[in-house]
Amino acid sequence: MFGSRIGKKFTYKAGLRGEMSRVTLDSRHDNISQTDYTFFLAPSLSGIYDIADGHELSLAVSRRIGRPTYPQLNPYMSMIDATTYEKGNMHLQPEKATKLDLGYSLSRGSFNLFLNGYVNHTSDYISQITAIDSQRLITTYVNAASDLKSGVDFTLRVNPVKWMNVSLAANTYYVSTSGEYEGAEISNKGVTNNSNVLFDFLPWKGGDIQCQYFVSTPQYFPQLTTSLTHQMNVGFKQRFLKGAMTASILLTDVFKTAKWEVSSHNNIFDLTNISRNKSRMLWFGFSYNFNSFKQKADQKTESDRSLIRLGL
C-alpha cells in the first residue's frame, strides 16, 4: 500500500494484493479426489479531493474474492420442511467482484449530506437455485455467469431544532443477474429502493424518543422476486444517575405491516409464498455502568502491539 498527497487538496492511496489458494476436494462417497490452485490479483485505488471547506469528493476502485461457505459446499441433503430440502455444491468456485465508488459529502454545522454512486460487477456469482425432484423442492447453490449492481446511496442528517434530529437514508439500485444451470433459468433484473427515515426527539434531559419508518420496494434475486414491504419502529430511552443507568423500551412493526411475499415464474415451476413472521415485538432493556472511568487527556493509550486481546 502506498499513499501520498498532491498539492493541498488531493490525497490518494494505491495498493496491490496477490493471493494464491489451494483447495483440495476429497470425497470417498463420490470417488473424487482433486486439488485446484487459484491465483487472485486485487489492485485497489482510492482518492479524496477537498473541494472547499465542508465539501469533499472521493473515489475508490477495488477487487475482492468471495469464497463459498460450508453450508454452500456441503453436498449432503438436509430437510427444511416436508417438501423442501437443501444441499450444497462441492464444485462451487469463488466469486470475483470489481467495484467502483464515487462519493460526495457536504457538512455544514447541523446539516450533513452524503451521496455515493457505485457499480459492482461480480463474475461466477454464487447464487441459490431451486429445482423440482420427485415432488420435492431441492435448493442448492451454483455459480451464475454474472451479477451487476449499480445505484446511488443517499444519506441526509439535519438538526432543525435543539430537541430534534432527523435522518433520511435511501439506497436505489439496478440489479441484473444472468445464468443457467441444468435447464433452470436463474436470471432476474429490476430496480429496487430501500429507504428509512428516523425522527429522534430529545424532550428533556436524559430522555430520547425515536420513531423510524422502513420501506423496501420489490427485491430481485435469482429466480425470486419479493413484494413491497414497510414497517415502523418506536423506541424510548431514559438515562439516570448522570448516565450510569439506562432504561429503554422498543416496539417493532407498530402497525404489523411487515411481510415476506415471494413469487417465482420460470421454466421449471411457478411459486407464490406469503408468510408473516413475528415482527411485532415489545422489548424492555435495563443497563447500569459500574465503571465510569474516564481517561485523562494526557494519558497514553495502549497500542495494538502492546495490547493482549482475549477472544474476538
Annotate each language-model stretch with its function.
Residues G18-T24, V61-R67, L106-R108, V119-S123, ...:
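Transmembrane beta-strands of outer-membrane beta-barrel pores
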Residues K9-Y12, G54-L57, S110-L113, K162-V166, ...:
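Repeated loop/turn-to-beta-strand initiation elements of outer-membrane beta-barrel proteins
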Residues M1-D30, T38-S44, I48, D53-K99, V119-T139, W163-Y174, Q219, ...:
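Surface-exposed extracellular loop regions of Gram-negative outer-membrane beta-barrel proteins
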Residues N89, Q93, K99, R108, ...:
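Outer membrane beta-barrel strand-and-loop segments of large Gram-negative receptors
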Residues L45, K189-L312:
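Conserved C-terminal beta-signal and adjacent last beta-strands/turns
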Residues S4-I6, G47-I51, R63, L106, ...:
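Residue-level signature of outer-membrane beta-barrel architecture
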